[in-house]
């Protein structure tokens, strides 16, 4: 969806801006209907003697749960900051111009799609925790060089590499939660982690207002390093069944 949506909206926008907005609204309604009709009963809870469901809150005492939440927080922060600010950064710096700048998100999600399909069907992780460390290091290195890019080709290539390295982090981290995964635990982990996608782009904007967008984008190296640190901490912990 993220790969194809920019093309769909661009096609609708050629007809009229109103149609593009209507297409977006229709897609939002479809998402709402999917959530509305998804069964979510019974998982992560047990029945008490009175017959009422008793929610299992034991995951809140797990250090691994909070480390994985922190890792996902950094992943969301780094990824959404690039998604939200990179077009503005590329255009403002003159690195990428014209229609290509608008399709940087498509480049990212194209890399994400390719990487996740490879992980799922061709090269599945035998040691997912160590793989998260490697992915975190890869994201940090590629983002550093992305900020040094001064040509259109290098920028697109490094953006693809950054997204490729980031692609497996989210599903691998969620899968690493093991039996802690439930409706209740995910209802805490995912919103808490998603706050990174709100906070970091805001921080970049505030820094950009005072020191320029290049400095703001440089701040995004912090959650990239956070990915590495949290991944190392998770890798050192004993697995929880």
Regions found by a protein language model. Give the residues of each.
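Helix-loop-helix hairpin linking two adjacent transmembrane segments in secondary transporters
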Residues: 1-43
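A membrane-interface helix-boundary motif in multi-pass transporters
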Residues: 11-25, 205-224
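Juxtamembrane intracellular "pre-TM" segments in multi-pass secondary transporters
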Residues: 38-68
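Helix-to-loop junctions at the C-terminal end of transmembrane segments
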Residues: 115-127, 208-209
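Intracellular juxtamembrane helix-capping segments at the cytosolic ends
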Residues: 166-181
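A late C-terminal transmembrane helix in Major Facilitator Superfamily
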Residues: 180-213, 217-220
């Amino acid at each position: 969806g993220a790969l194809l949506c920019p093309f769909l909206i661009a096609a609708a926008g050629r007809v009229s801006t109103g149609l593009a907005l209507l297409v977006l609204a229709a897609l939002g309604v479809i998402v709402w209907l999917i959530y509305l009709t998804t069964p979510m009963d019974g998982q992560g809870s047990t029945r008490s003697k009175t017959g009422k469901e008793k929610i299992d809150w034991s995951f809140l005492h797990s250090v691994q749960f909070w480390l994985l939440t922190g890792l996902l927080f950094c992943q969301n922060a780094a990824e959404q900051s690039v998604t939200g600010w990179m077009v503005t950064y590329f255009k403002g710096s003159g690195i990428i111009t014209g229609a290509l700048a608008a399709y940087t998100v498509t480049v990212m999600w194209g890399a994400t799609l390719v990487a996740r399909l490879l992980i799922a069907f061709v090269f599945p992780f035998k040691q997912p925790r160590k793989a998260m460390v490697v992915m975190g290091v890869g994201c940090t290195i590629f983002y550093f060089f992305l900020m040094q890019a001064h040509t259109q080709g290098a920028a697109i290539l490094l953006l693809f590499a950054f997204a490729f390295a980031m692609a497996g982090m989210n599903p691998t981290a969620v899968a690493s939660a093991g039996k802690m995964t439930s409706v209740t635990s995910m209802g805490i982990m995912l919103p808490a982690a998603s706050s990174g996608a709100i906070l970091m782009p805001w921080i970049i904007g505030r820094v950009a207002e005072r020191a320029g967008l290049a400095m703001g984008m440089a701040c995004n190296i912090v959650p990239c390093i956070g990915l590495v640190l949290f991944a190392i901490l998770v890798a050192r912990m004993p697995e929880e069944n």
